[in-house]
Amino acid sequence: MTQITNVSLRRILDSRGNPTVEADVLTQSGGFGRAAAPSGASTGEYEAIELDPAEAIASARDHVAPRLIDTVHAGNQREVDAALHAADGTDNFSQIGANSAVAISMAAAKAGADVLGAPVYQHLGGTFRGESFPTPLGNVVGGGEHAKEATHIQEFLSAPIGAPNVSEAVFANAAVHARVSEILDERGIPAAKGDEGAWAPPISDAEAFSLVNDAVADVEDDLGFEIRFGLDMAAAELYDDDVGGYVYGDEVKSTTEQVEYVAEMIAEYNLVYVEDPLDENDYDGFATLTERVGDQTLICGDDLFVTSVERLQTGIDADAANSILIKPNQIGTLTDAFDAIELAREHGYETVVSHRSGETEDVTIAHLAVATDAGFIKTGTVQGERTAKLNELIRIAEDAV
């Protein structure tokens, strides 16, 4: 029933106006799945290789389609993803491109679910599926690689951890985003938006902390449940090998100073989440920070782990971080992402399923977050390619009751 009979690929636009890969998978019984690959702006050194979309599509047509069609079953995700690895023949998808691989992997999952008449989260969930739903982390102020001439810290994230349900959490983040805009207007500070829809005012990091803290407090008072905030520091983008430190404009922080700075911000603002606070190669720095504040907050590895089982195991052995960001396109397939999630769970690491800065209307990650019982999902606050996932999360929560 789920034997794959056709795989088609095309270029479509992502949210930044750049081309990306979209895949369609059709099965013998008429099951159909469509998915599109996202793309990051701040990418980890160890991510799977993203090829030019036209090159990725041509390579996938030559190498992947013949291995899948009339041979592999969409209902068996591991079989699909093993075929993708075999077709590529490298350890980082440099032959067919992680962008073509992840699009096909996700499209096959949808086709398999379609045959069963089940939502994707049920098809993927298996033993992972719990009773809870992920808390959305909403990007409300941004800078770094997502918005030039703004904050050095890449993302300030609203976290409605006290929301009674998914819907209220989603709307709480939207309210914080709106309140940030109101406060900026009151203070006479102009602000455009960055890649992910967050406000990108020309203010210092210190001013941004105060701004987001005020906005979160105001909305928390209005809604009556706990809202905190967190950060994606994207510190690999701040770290300069030539100077051996983290560059904040005219200031350079050593690793020791960076750890101290992050610990102070966690204490001062009761941060619930800090992603990539140190360079992607600094397991020791992550371990030092985790030992110091890991009982107070989530220290999350994105560029540190790149959804890789091998890099996560290195982190586990070093006691570096206590949570992992999951981005399927970083590693190339849903199976690889599942394996990282399973290893994280075995060792008590929280999982955070995430979008990329260059996104499409694809909603697979909403299903992945629910299927794997992730603690958080990071997929923006506003803009259509972000709200597509958030609205799908609301629908899933309603369907699963």
UniProtKB/Swiss-Prot annotation:
Pathway: Carbohydrate degradation; glycolysis; pyruvate from D-glyceraldehyde 3-phosphate: step 4/5
A Pfam family of this chain: Enolase_N
Top-level taxon in the UniProt lineage: Archaea
Subcellular location(s) of the protein: Cytoplasm; Secreted; Cell surface
One GO biological process term: glycolytic process
Entry keyword annotation includes Nucleotide-binding: no
Molecular function (Gene Ontology), one example: magnesium ion binding
Residues engaged in binding Mg(2+): D232, E275, D302
EC assignment: 4.2.1.11
Role, per record: Catalyzes the reversible conversion of 2-phosphoglycerate (2-PG) into phosphoenolpyruvate (PEP). It is essential for the degradation of carbohydrates via glycolysis.
Protein name: Enolase
Organism listed in the record: Haloquadratum walsbyi (strain DSM 16790 / HBSQ001)
Gene: eno
